[in-house]
Every structure is written in C-alpha cells, then in structure tokens.
C-alpha cells in the first residue's frame, strides 16, 4: 500500500484525548493531526519522536493531517512503525489480491464487514474456489518490549477477546475461522501481552484449542508506504484440555 501523496515529516509534541496529536513540522508550524489509534501506544508516543503525517484531500475535514508512522526507539534499535489502525484491513485485502496470504490460497473473494456472532461483524469472509467459507479477524500490532518480539494488545481489549470467542463459535458450528495479526514493523515472533490483558490471552488460547487458526505477518514500513512482508512464528500456545494439570 503506497501512500497516495508524500508524507509530511514532523516531531511529536504530544498525543492526547486518544485521537489527537500535536506535531511540530520542520518549518516550526504546530499542527494537530488525527491519531487513528485507540490503544495505549506504549513506546510510540514519546515527545520528540520523528513522525510522518498524511495530508487530507478533503477540504471540509476539521483536521488536515493523519498520523501514519513514527520512528520509535524500540528494543533492538529504532525503526519506522505504522500506528494507523485503519490500515491493517486494507493491507490484508491488498495481500489477498496479490496472492501473498498462503492461508487464504484458493479463495476467490474476500468480503468485508460481514455480520456474524452476537451482533458482531467479522473483518472479512473468504469464499469461493470450492473451499469452505472462512471468517477472518484482523488485529493490528505495534507493541515491542523485547527485541524482535511483537505483542498484542497494548491495553485491555475486551472487544478483541469477544471476537476470539465468536471465531471459536464458528469452528464449533463446523466452519473455518482465523486470526491474522498485522505487525506494522519488523519483528521475529509474536506473542500475547498476557500481563496487559490476561482475559484476551485466555480467549485466544481457548480459540486456538477450539480449532481457530492464527497467523502473524510483519510489514515493510517506510515513508513511501506499508505492505505485508512475511509470516512470523506465534508463540502463544492453545489452552490445555480441562483437567490436564498444565497451563
């Protein structure tokens, strides 16, 4: 996914009210950008970090910029990280069209926002090609507290835990369901940040034990664009059967 116009560089002054960020541009102008990220953004929102903003083409929009990337000082060294949580679904759709997602090989269509479960909408429903329909939930990941290890979530994620339960319900009913974690940075492996949200950890492990598939992909991130790069290992283990005495 290439950005449609060149990004604007600045330095982060502060991120506040979850969805707002003040940025000092190179010429000294202070602008307020939309921050499309409801999470804690641990390690990504320090004052002075270099950031890149996409300019809005809508003259009626209140905020003229959206925060896209941050050059964060992460364990293992600095790197560009995508912080816009609206991007991962588009990245998955693009990778599907380009046949870059092996777990979805053979499917012909990928429909977005399909109703299922308890008044929920799954991110995608893959169908066609003589294959059973597959419910696909996408999660954005940009937390790194150990070199090479990407983690999710970076705050309590009750809605995401519910999504895992509903995917497990799809499998229990005889269907196919999967989680795709889009890591908007370089990483070597993925795991759940269970110390941040043990409830999501339990929900994912139960879903894996029920037969839900899970895949994690890193991204190539830079000023020109973001694209899904390669799969990495998921370290989270399925929940053990009840009464097994293991965790």
UniProtKB/Swiss-Prot annotation:
Pfam families: SfsA, SfsA_N. InterPro entries: SfsA (IPR005224), SfsA_C (IPR040452), SfsA_N (IPR041465). CDD domains: SfsA-like_bacterial. GO terms for molecular function: DNA binding. Coiled coil: none annotated. Belongs to the SfsA family. This is Sugar fermentation stimulation protein homolog. It comes from Methylorubrum populi (strain ATCC BAA-705 / NCIMB 13946 / BJ001) (Methylobacterium populi).
């Amino acid at each position: 996914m290439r950005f449609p116009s060149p990004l604007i560089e600045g330095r982060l002054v502060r991120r506040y009210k979850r969805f707002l960020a003040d940025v000092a541009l190179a010429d000294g102008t202070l602008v307020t950008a939309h921050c499309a990220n409801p999470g804690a953004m641990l390690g990504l929102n320090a004052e002075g970090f270099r950031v890149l903003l996409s300019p809005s083409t809508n003259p009626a929009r209140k905020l003229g910029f959206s925060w896209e990337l941050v050059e964060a000082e992460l364990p293992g060294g600095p790197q560009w990280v995508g912080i816009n949580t609206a991007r991962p679904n588009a990245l998955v759709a693009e990778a599907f069209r380009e046949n870059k997602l092996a777990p979805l090989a053979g499917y012909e269509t990928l429909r977005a926002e399909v109703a299922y479960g308890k008044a929920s909408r799954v991110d995608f429903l893959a169908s066609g090609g003589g294959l059973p329909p597959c419910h696909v939930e996408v999660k954005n990941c940009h937390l790194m507290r150990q070199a090479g290890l990407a983690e999710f979530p970076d705050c309590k994620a009750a809605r995401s835990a519910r999504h895992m339960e509903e995917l497990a319900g799809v499998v229990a009913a005889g269907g196919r369901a999967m989680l795709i974690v889009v890591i908007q940075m370089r990483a070597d492996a993925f795991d759940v940040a269970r110390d941040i949200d043990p409830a999501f950890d339990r929900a994912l492990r139960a879903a894996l034990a029920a037969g839900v598939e899970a895949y994690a992909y890193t991204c190539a991130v830079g000023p020109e664009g973001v694209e899904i790069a390669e799969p990495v290992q998921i370290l989270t283990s399925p929940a053990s059967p009840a009464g097994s005495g293991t965790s």
